[in-house]
């Protein structure tokens, strides 16, 4: 536990000393928020939204890789971290495709549960479906916890996935605790965002930016732990 506490503390210290690390995730959150506002407001056509979905997804992955690269090499600039992340564009595209497919499969139980609940009114089915989806999500995060840094460390996509899974399996207790911490932090942030969203689109945007701060911290903890174990 003392080792994990040190990782969490050192990650906070790094962010205090180098706040520029927040910028990639803040930019990604801003881009994603504007895309979502365009979706719900109807101000952007469906075709344009579909065309923008790919670039928005790529920005999200590149932001994660930029954070990991600045943790790995604390002395590098934001510009250098961008070029490092961009050099992994093939792995980034494969990651988007793989995560999209896995995300769809993970959401299936809950989607079926909601559909069944609307037809039958069975809360048991809905609750069971939610538990299954959350469990699958937890297992997925556990297995992929180190993917940003392993993509930078490994030569190809397959080996980076395998390395992330192997590290998680070799230290199940610590990675489980870190995964639980990530869920808790994001859960608290999401809950607090409900108050901001009452302010409308501005509140939603502020909530997303707040969440990106918590997400940045999580994406600093992951490579920090990987590089020190």
Q: Residue locations for each model-derived region?
A:
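Hydrophobic alpha-helical membrane segments
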Residues: 1-229
């Amino acid at each position: 536990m003392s080792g994990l506490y040190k990782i969490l503390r050192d990650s906070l210290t790094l962010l205090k000393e180098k706040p520029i690390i927040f910028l990639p995730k803040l930019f990604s959150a801003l881009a994603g928020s504007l895309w979502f506002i365009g979706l719900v407001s109807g101000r952007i056509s469906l075709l344009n939204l579909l065309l923008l979905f790919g670039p928005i997804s790529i920005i999200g992955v590149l932001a994660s890789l930029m954070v990991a690269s600045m943790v790995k090499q604390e002395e590098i600039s934001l510009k250098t971290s961008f070029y490092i992340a961009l050099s992994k564009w093939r792995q980034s595209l494969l990651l988007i495709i793989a995560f999209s497919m896995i995300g769809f499969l993970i959401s299936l139980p809950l989607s079926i549960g909601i559909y069944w609940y609307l037809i039958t009114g069975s809360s048991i089915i809905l609750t069971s479906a939610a538990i299954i989806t959350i469990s699958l999500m937890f297992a997925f995060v556990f297995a992929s916890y180190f993917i940003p840094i392993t993509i930078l460390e490994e030569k190809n996509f397959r080996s980076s996935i395998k390395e992330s899974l192997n590290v998680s399996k070799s230290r199940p207790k610590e990675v489980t605790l870190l995964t639980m911490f990530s869920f808790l932090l994001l859960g608290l942030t999401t809950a607090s965002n409900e108050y901001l969203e009452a302010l409308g689109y501005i509140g939603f945007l502020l909530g997303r930016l707040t969440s990106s701060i918590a997400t940045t911290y999580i994406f600093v903890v992951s490579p920090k732990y990987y590089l020190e174990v």
